[in-house]
């Protein structure tokens, strides 16, 4: 059964300026990288910038989601916890996360969304995340429309997010270790060297 919901247009923003423009041009929500532990390691945003974006977005009833979507080391968990509390205090609407270890931290009452980096491509995975307390699940970018429909029909009560624009790779998000193996730069730490994008050439059929 298909459950109809109002579609939320969620736009990416690498920084405060891009986020403000996305809101000004009609985005319902914007996602932006946290000061640390985001999948775009080079896109570092200060708490002050995120707070300014939250303030601007809320003037227009738009929402701000912050990505904390890398695999964390054990020694980083306390710092992550402190950062999440700071993000909560400045009014961030939700976090997009990859590492399930975050769910074991002492968290404020802030909604968690399951990142595409979690490799969310089956109904079973979506149900698992919903049962673990995730409010929304970002599906794998590599899914077909038929596969997305199947997941929605199997999990009609779970809000799903899907990418409609952006880069793709020959590997599933969150499951590729080529960059780490070849260059010592882990895609799951926000440092993908884009190696597979460089070598993959589609041949005409």
What are these regions (language model features)?
Residues 31-49, 68-75:
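Glycine-rich, proline-tolerant flexible connector loops at the mouths of alpha/beta enzymes
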Residues 9-12, 30-32, 64-68, 95-97, ...:
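Hydrophobic faces of well-ordered beta-strands that scaffold small-molecule active sites
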Residues 197-205:
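Residue-level detector of conserved catalytic or cofactor/ligand-binding positions
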Residues 41-51, 98-108, 142-155:
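Active-site-adjacent beta->alpha loops and helix N-cap segments on the catalytic face
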Residues 124, 147, 154-198:
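Conserved anion-binding
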Residues 22, 99, 129, 162:
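Conserved, mostly hydrophobic/aromatic
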Residues 56, 62-128:
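N-terminal active-site wall of soluble small-molecule enzyme domains
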Residues 2-29:
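N-terminal basic/disordered segments at the start of proteins
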């Amino acid at each position: 059964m298909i459950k109809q919901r109002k579609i939320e247009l969620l736009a990416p923003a690498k920084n405060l300026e891009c986020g403000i423009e996305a809101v000004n041009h009609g985005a319902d929500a914007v996602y932006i990288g946290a000061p640390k532990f985001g999948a775009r390691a080079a896109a570092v945003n200060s708490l002050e910038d995120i707070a300014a974006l939250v303030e601007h977005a809320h003037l227009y009833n738009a929402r701000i989601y912050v990505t904390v979507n890398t695999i964390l080391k054990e020694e980083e968990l306390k710092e992550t916890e402190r950062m999440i509390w700071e993000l909560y205090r400045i009014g961030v609407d939700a976090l997009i996360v990859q590492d399930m270890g975050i769910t074991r931290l002492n968290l404020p009452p802030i909604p968690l969304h399951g990142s595409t980096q979690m490799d969310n491509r089956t109904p079973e995975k979506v149900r698992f995340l919903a049962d673990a307390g995730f409010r929304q699940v970002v599906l794998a970018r590599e899914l077909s429309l038929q596969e997305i429909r199947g997941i929605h029909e199997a999990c009609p009560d779970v809000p799903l997010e899907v990418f409609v624009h952006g880069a793709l790779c020959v590997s599933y998000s969150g499951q590729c270790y080529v960059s780490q193996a070849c260059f010592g730069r882990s895609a799951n730490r926000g440092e993908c060297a884009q190696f597979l994008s460089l070598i993959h050439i589609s041949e005409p059929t």
